[in-house]
Amino acid sequence: MLNPSRRGTVYGTLLNHADALAALGAAACAPPYKAPPVAPVLYIKPRNTWIGAGEAIVVPEGVAELEIGATLGLVIGRAACRVREANALAFVAGYVIVCDVSMPHASYYRPALRFKARDTFCPIGPFMPRDAVGATDVLESLRIAVSIDGEVVHRASTSGLIRPPARLIADVSGFMTLSPGDVLSVGVAAGAPRARAGQRVSITIDGLGRLDNPLVAEGPPA
């Protein structure tokens, strides 16, 4: 994984997969928003959520299952401020697998911190340098698979992104600077599978390898 001491902020992107937006149906146009988002919708996975391959995802007491969101993470290599889409990938140092874990919830636009920012809720996988993955067209067709206890339960592809990686960086850097070490995850597809304590989840992305993590039940309070 990317050395946590060198990592900046980890950002997640909501509703950037076409099928995730479609799954909302009429709710995407309901008050108070009344229309689908026209700019990237971001949230933060704080430092307490970060773990590496092989480390345990903790299932909070009273929670039966967790949603396992598999996504591609873009690791920023140099400060990106108002960059053009055509140049955006030049600001990327490499890529990681991100397991964006959540407690199941219905609030898509403004999920409470307790649903997405619990300890261990962001395993981050092996770092792959940009040049080892390939050009823009490769990034836009990466296959993503989630397995639970060795069985593939969910498949997705970056081809379903509303904003592919280069455009996402350009749009986000248009309103805030992305700093070296930041990780911008591109978003989770619809139908994220659920897993429970005692199971093991594995995420693979073409060219990036594998990220494996067991799930364990939360222990008693200290």
Task: Describe every region a protein language model picked out.
Residues S5, L15, V38, G52, ...:
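Conserved active-site and cofactor/substrate-binding residues in soluble primary-metabolism enzymes
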Residues G69-G73, V92-V96, P123, S141-R143, ...:
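Broad gene-expression machinery/nucleic-acid interaction feature
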Residues M1-T71, P123:
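Extended, compositionally biased flexible segments
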Residues M1-S5, A20, S102-A222:
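Catalytic-pocket segment enriched in acidic/His residues
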Residues K45-R47, A70-L72, I76-R78, V96-V101, ...:
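Short, structured patches in soluble enzyme cores that scaffold and shape functional sites
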Residues L24-P32, E85-V96:
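Short Gly/aromatic-enriched secondary-structure transition segments
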Residues M1-L2, P31-P32, V58-L66, A80-N87, ...:
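A generic local secondary-structure boundary/capping motif
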Residues A20-L21, A53, V83-E85, H105-S107:
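Short helix/loop capping segments that flank catalytic or ligand/cofactor-binding pockets
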